[in-house]
């Protein structure tokens, strides 16, 4: 396919135009008085969102070159979302402001490479400053504040996430599900829970709630498919003599063996429940190993030279209580702290070493199941459109709280960046010169963009608000919700330091790339043909 090649100023201006469009669509959502954006969907109802990265992903322009600009600035939002999980709108607004400032300087003859060096040095200085000003998150009140701000000033959500975090600990997993009611509810599971339920409903012990509850059971864990009754009989005899219930976790249990278990259960010979092993492939093996360590048993696997028919009671695990529903199994075990701790440490090391985001997520899930537990927030709303919007806001809020716990909190509402403007200006003038100084100064000027935009979205003059904030102490900022200047920590308007830092770093990275661009190569649009589609031989040529 033929390509168009555009050089220097023309190329940068085309990129800028694409960025202007995306930045404006995203920036309207910034702050407590930010508006929503409606996204048309080819299938299903339109989606109403207030989330920067979701809007950025939807925007596709007709002009190929402008679309390249959109893709670049979208990267700043996506990368911030991947790193910190929130702050995508701030990253977009910052990147746009830096590009606008930078292009003026490049047009005036500044050297783009020297500008880039200046930008990088200024960002490094600012990252250190943000870390200096960050306060650690000590109590659930601070967590609730971070979550509430991130969810669009929803205090109820803030309280719920703080409670979930309190229950499952810092390494626990908080997951979101679409609820069935109008209200959003929190459900916390103690112990290890995995997404596999009983194989047959005949195993239930509580017919009203349709769940099987086993008190102090033995747990048989195997990675093989159980097909023959002969394999199971020795195991069942040993457990029946011990007089305790039995939970079987296996790859699958075929008809004949399953029928034997059901008959034993119905006759009252043995209280037994069978579930399929969670996960797939290597992940399944790892999860079975986790369950074995948690319950003090071992995985009966032919790879280890262990056969089911020779299994003895001392290779079974045990738990205080097991609850099995049609979709989930929850194991509450105790007494194996040392082994569990060692396993958690091993998983933590794997998390540090892996590069794949998906693997990280799955390892984090395993760690949570072993160490803390799992909290599920069931998102409720009147309509599906509202539910999707709430779900996105909650996702941001959960990510923001995790980021806050990691690196602490700083004054929110664009305040931190605005207060750092004089500091970075002073530092740059003392340490840099020439075009590097110009690069650092363009970063300094761009830092006011998020606060300016928050004020404008609240119907105020952004530049006046920015100047007023800069005159005040570091923790004092502009509360757009109530149109007042307040101490941000006291008012609970805080941002995770990690979110502010990531937004700044990713915005600067994209701005540097755009400023150092000298040519763009894009596909030439195909000429539109005026001929009707398809030659002869269509359906219309025939009489039926």
From Swiss-Prot:
EC numbers: 5.6.1.7
Cross-referenced PROSITE patterns: CHAPERONINS_CPN60
GO terms, biological process: protein refolding
Gene Ontology MF terms: ATP binding; ATP-dependent protein folding chaperone; isomerase activity; unfolded protein binding
CDD domains, per the entry: GroEL
Record has Nucleotide-binding as a keyword: yes
Ranges of compositional bias, category Gly residues: 533-544
Pfam families: Cpn60_TCP1
EC class (word): isomerase
Segments of this protein annotated with the region Disordered: 525-544
Chief location: cytoplasm
GO cellular component: cytoplasm
Chain residues that bind ATP: 29-32, 86-90, 413, 495
Oligomer and partners: Forms a cylinder of 14 subunits composed of two heptameric rings stacked back-to-back. Interacts with the co-chaperonin GroES.
Protein name: Chaperonin GroEL 2
Organism, as annotated: Synechococcus sp. (strain JA-3-3Ab)
């Amino acid at each position: 396919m033929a390509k168009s090649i555009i050089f220097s100023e023309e190329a940068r201006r085309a990129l800028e135009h694409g960025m202007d469009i995306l930045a404006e669509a995203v920036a309207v959502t910034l702050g407590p008085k930010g508006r929503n954006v409606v996204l048309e969907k080819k299938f299903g109802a339109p989606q109403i969102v207030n989330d920067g990265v979701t809007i950025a992903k939807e925007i596709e322009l007709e002009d190929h070159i402008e679309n390249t600009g959109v893709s670049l600035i979208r990267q700043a939002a996506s990368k911030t979302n991947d790193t910190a999980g929130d702050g995508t709108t701030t990253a977009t607004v910052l990147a746009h402001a830096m590009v606008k400032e930078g292009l003026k300087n490049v047009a005036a003859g500044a050297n783009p490479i020297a500008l880039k060096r200046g930008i990088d040095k200024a960002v490094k200085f600012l990252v250190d400053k943000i870390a200096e000003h960050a306060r650690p998150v000590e109590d659930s009140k601070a967590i609730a504040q971070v979550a509430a701000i991130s969810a669009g000033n929803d205090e109820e959500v803030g309280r719920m996430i703080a409670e979930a975090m309190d229950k499952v600990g810092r390494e626990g997993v908080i997951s979101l599900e679409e609820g069935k009611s109008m209200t959003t509810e929190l459900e916390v599971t103690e112990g290890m829970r995995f997404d596999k339920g009983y194989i047959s409903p005949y195993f239930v012990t509580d017919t009203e709630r349709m769940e099987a509850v086993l008190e102090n059971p033995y747990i048989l864990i195997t990675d093989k498919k159980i097909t023959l009754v002969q394999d199971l009989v020795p195991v069942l005899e040993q457990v029946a003599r011990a007089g305790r219930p039995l939970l079987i976790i296996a790859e699958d249990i075929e008809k004949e063996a399953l029928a034997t278990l059901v008959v034993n259960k119905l006759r009252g010979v043995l209280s037994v429940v069978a579930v399929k092993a969670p996960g797939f492939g290597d992940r399944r093996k790892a999860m079975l190993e986790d369950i074995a360590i948690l319950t003090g048993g071992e995985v009966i696997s032919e790879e280890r030279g262990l056969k089911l028919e020779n299994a003895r009671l001392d290779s079974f695990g045990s738990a205080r209580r097991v609850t099995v529903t049609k979709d989930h199994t929850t194991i509450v075990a105790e007494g194996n702290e040392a082994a569990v701790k060692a396993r958690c440490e091993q998983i933590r090391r794997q998390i540090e070493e892996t590069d794949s985001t998906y693997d990280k997520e799955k390892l984090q899930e395993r760690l949570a199941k072993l160490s803390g537990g799992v909290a599920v927030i069931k998102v409720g709303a009147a309509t599906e459109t509202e539910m999707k919007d709430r779900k996105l806001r909650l996702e941001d809020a959960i990510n923001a709280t995790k980021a806050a716990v990691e690196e602490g909190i700083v004054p929110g509402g664009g305040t931190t960046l605005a207060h750092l403007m004089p500091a970075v200006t002073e530092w740059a003038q003392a340490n840099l010169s020439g075009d590097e100084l110009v690069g650092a100064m363009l970063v300094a000027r761009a830092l006011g963009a998020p606060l300016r935009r928050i004020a404008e979205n609240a119907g105020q003059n952004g530049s006046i608000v920015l100047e007023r904030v800069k005159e005040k102490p570091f923790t004092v900022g502009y509360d757009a919700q109530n149109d007042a200047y307040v101490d941000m920590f006291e008012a609970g308007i805080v941002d995770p330091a990690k979110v502010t830092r990531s937004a700044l770093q990713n915005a600067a990275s994209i701005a540097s790339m755009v400023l150092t661009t000298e040519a763009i190569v894009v596909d030439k649009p195909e000429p539109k043909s005026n001929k009707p589609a398809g030659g002869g031989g269509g359906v219309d040529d025939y009489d039926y």
